[in-house]
Amino acid sequence: MRSGRVILAVAAAMGSAAAVQQALTVRDRRRYPAPGLLVRTDGHQMHMHVRGADVSGPTVVLEAGMGSFSPNWHWVQQELAPTVRSVAYDRAGLGWSRRSRRPRDAQTIAVELREALREAGIEPPYVLAGHSFGGLPVRAFADLYPELTAGLVLVDASHPDQWVRWPTPYAAKILEVSQWVFGWLGWFGLPRALNLTRRVSAGLPARQAAELRAGAALPGYAATEARQIRLWSVSRAQLNAAAPLGDLPLAVLAVSKQPVGGELLTALQHELAELTESASFEIVQGASHESVISNRKYAQVVATAIRGVVQAAIDRSLKS
């Protein structure tokens, strides 16, 4: 009898939590409407936030890292706006973009990005900047669409081999399982209560930080991240088989504040700088993996690097 009452109490509590989560989700959708364009690709909605001057030259496309989406690029877009047109978008299943039935490997994400850019009327060429996990799909984009790609910027970007070489055994699997767990618990509001975006949003204005927190509280958010991690080996194979990038302008930014495995992570960033014949490499002093784009001071460094690649792309096009 006692165990039956406990089960009923737990079920009632979970039901109440789910009802509260649903009510808060409805509230958040009213409170935080999409700031950018909503386009449809292959039956699902994609969000693209365009900012900046409509000038000649490449458009900068900003790809967020694992656990984040377009508001994370607020300071970078603001710094670029006077002279460069940029678009920060949300991968399918994150932010204001709806879930895709397609697999979450780097090439598929790149194909969806190309479709969304086309539907939004954002013409090439593009300079693509990827932070963290976002480095994988922007590299896949450059491989699939070299004629559309004018340059790359990798901001403390993931290396395809990082989990194979990581000192902690099964680190990727642990991360994947944790995301699936949080995805299930998302129906009951736990990710909202824990504020899982507090690190990636630290330093952003209150509005953008709140948008990130609301987006991360959606039940499908963590499940989408888990799907990306599950197919990491597929993305790794795709990128390791990619064609050489030649003299494509490339800037690689690493950070000085690294977690466990910092020496390996910095070495991997140096390897990324060997992807092209005309790459620059810089360590952003004082920045961590998250603050390099969420902190305004460090975002200025990122924006400067992006402008440098945009100019290098323009100079390269004039020579060809």
Q: For the regions a protein language model found, what residue spans apply to each?
A:
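Conserved hydrolase catalytic core segment
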Residues: 123-166
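Catalytic active-site module of serine/aspartate enzymes centered on a nucleophile-bearing elbow/loop
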Residues: 277-320
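Short amphipathic, positively biased membrane-proximal segments
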Residues: 1-47, 51, 56, 92, ...
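A catalytic-pocket lid/entrance helix-loop region that shapes and gates access to the active site
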Residues: 154-194
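Conserved catalytic-core motifs of eukaryotic protein kinase domains, centered on the activation segment
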Residues: 73-74, 97-103, 164-165
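Active-site loop/oxyanion-hole signature of alpha/beta-hydrolase fold enzymes
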Residues: 51, 88-129
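Conserved HGGG/HGGXW glycine-rich cap/lid loop of the alpha/beta-hydrolase fold
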Residues: 50-96
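Conserved serine/cysteine hydrolase catalytic core
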Residues: 207-285
